[in-house]
């Protein structure tokens, strides 16, 4: 796991509240795929510092579980939301061993899956814990956007990419997996999911006032992909 989400957890939380990529592109594009959540059971899978949890609690959810591999992030969630959420540390590469079958109406998994090598295993676990008629919404790096980082030059070959990001104000090493759209959709199909929506998101116009250059780039080039799939 990158130091971004452990050592720099508090700084990442502060930045993610309002930066263009999270607040003005990823979150509104993900939320647009959700059905009304009032009285629903929700699993925030890869919850980070609890920014989505804050939104869910305003929607009058019946029960909210927040899990993340970073203990530092989970501590932030507990500090913010206390007993309003069931928050605990869980490495998603190990599945969802603490979660029972058929519990959740909705699962959200924002900007997490590109850090995991084995998508089929996690999708099978997500399918297991969803109620019949439930759904999962997730966002991840767009396959096209990541291909420019490819070392092999083979779009269809999964590969691990290493970059340095300055999200928290200093360079931090981040490693993630680049994979084809086919690999993503086939893993969903194999788990039993049916894809009902697939979008590339829309950057909010407010971003233009913050950084015209970034707004222009995100308006012309895909950065994330957003998928809703049904059980």
State each model region's role.
Residues 138-140, 144, 168-183:
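Acceptor-substrate binding/catalytic loop of class I
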Residues 1-37, 51-55, 73-76, 80, 136-164:
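Conserved class I S-adenosyl-L-methionine
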Residues 97-107:
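A short acidic, Gly/Pro-enriched loop at the edge of an enzyme's catalytic core
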Residues 120-135:
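A short glycine-rich, Lys/Arg-flanked "PGG" loop and its adjoining helix->strand segment in the class I
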Residues 175-199:
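Short alpha-helix
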Residues 43-45, 49-96:
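Class I SAM-dependent methyltransferase SAM/SAH-binding core
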Residues 105-119:
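A short SAM/SAH-binding and catalytic strip from SAM-dependent methyltransferases
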């Amino acid at each position: 796991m990158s130091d971004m989400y452990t050592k720099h957890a508090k700084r990442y939380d502060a930045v993610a509240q309002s930066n263009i990529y999270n607040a003005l592109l990823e979150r509104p594009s993900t939320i647009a795929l959700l059905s009304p959540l009032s009285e629903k059971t929700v699993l925030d899978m890869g919850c980070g510092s609890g920014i989505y949890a804050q939104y869910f609690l305003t929607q009058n959810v019946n029960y909210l579980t927040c899990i993340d591999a970073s203990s530092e992030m989970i501590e932030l969630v507990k500090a913010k939301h206390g007993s309003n959420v069931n928050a605990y540390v869980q490495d998603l590469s190990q599945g969802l061993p603490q979660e029972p079958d058929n519990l959740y109406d909705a699962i959200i998994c924002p900007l997490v899956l590109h850090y995991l090598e084995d998508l089929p295993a996690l999708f099978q676990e997500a399918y297991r814990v969803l109620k019949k008629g439930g759904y999962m919404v997730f966002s991840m790096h767009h396959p096209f956007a990541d291909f420019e980082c490819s070392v092999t030059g083979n779009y269809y070959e999964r590969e691990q990419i290493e970059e340095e990001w300055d999200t928290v104000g200093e360079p931090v090493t981040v490693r993630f997996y680049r994979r084809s759209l086919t690999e993503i959709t086939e893993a969903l199909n194999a788990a039993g999911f049916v894809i009902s929506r697939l979008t590339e998101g829309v950057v909010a116009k407010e971003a233009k006032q913050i950084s015209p250059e970034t707004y222009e780039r995100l308006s012309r080039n895909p950065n994330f992909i957003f998928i809703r799939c049904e059980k």
